[in-house]
Amino acid sequence: MEKKYKLTEETFAVDGHVLHRIKALRDFGNVKKGDLGGSIEEEYNLAHDWNCWIYNDAVVRGNATVCGNAEVEKKSAYG
């Protein structure tokens, strides 16, 4: 499976969790290569397949996973 995003060097902490900003590595869905997305704690928080994406300042951390064609905007998801 080809990765669709990478973790950038841009990080910040929330409630003791270190979050990484994501950057698209290829075009998919409404996302273009080079687009910056929201932030995740680990790669399992956002699937590399399908068209799912985390936008802007949205955060996904803990055991939460975004997959399928789900889009996360302006909120946090954690489990």
PLM regions and their residue ranges:
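Terminal amphipathic alpha-helical/low-complexity segments used for targeting or macromolecular assembly
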Residues: 1-51, 69, 75
